[in-house]
């Protein structure tokens, strides 16, 4: 499966996390995959990159790994979210 060619998977994951902070990792994957199909490997690689680059933090809570944006991630996600929402509207037409 391919992600949309317009955005890198990291951008999509970051934008979706903006509206779903504290979500379990696999639950975020399901949300992202519903609109932007990607393999689990692609999703987890994107998540790993975002953590390494300091955009996302992962915490173990209630027996699950949960994801949170850092301040850097929040600032970047705001602009990505707008662009991705616009792209989704264009695709619907």
From Swiss-Prot:
Record keywords, A-Z: DNA-binding, Transcription, Transcription regulation
Gene3D superfamilies, A to Z: Winged helix-like DNA-binding domain superfamily/Winged helix DNA-binding domain
Disulfide bridges in this chain: none
Record-linked SUPFAM superfamilies: Winged helix' DNA-binding domain
Gene Ontology molecular function, alphabetical: DNA binding
UniProt keyword Transcription present: yes
Subunit composition and interactions: Homodimer.
Function: Probable transcription factor that recognizes a (pseudo-)palindromic DNA target sequence.
Name of the protein: Protein F-93
Species of provenance: Sulfolobus spindle-shape virus 1
């Amino acid at each position: 499966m391919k992600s949309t060619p317009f955005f890198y998977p990291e951008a999509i994951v970051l934008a979706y996390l903006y509206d779903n902070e504290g979500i379990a990792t696999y639950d975020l994957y399901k949300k992202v995959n519903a609109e932007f199909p990607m393999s689990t490997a692609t999703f987890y690689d994107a998540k790993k990159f975002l953590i390494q680059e300091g955009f996302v933090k992962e915490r173990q809570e209630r027996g699950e790994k949960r994801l949170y944006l850092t301040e850097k991630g929040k600032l970047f996600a705001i602009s990505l979210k707008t662009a991705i929402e616009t792209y989704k509207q264009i695709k619907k037409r």
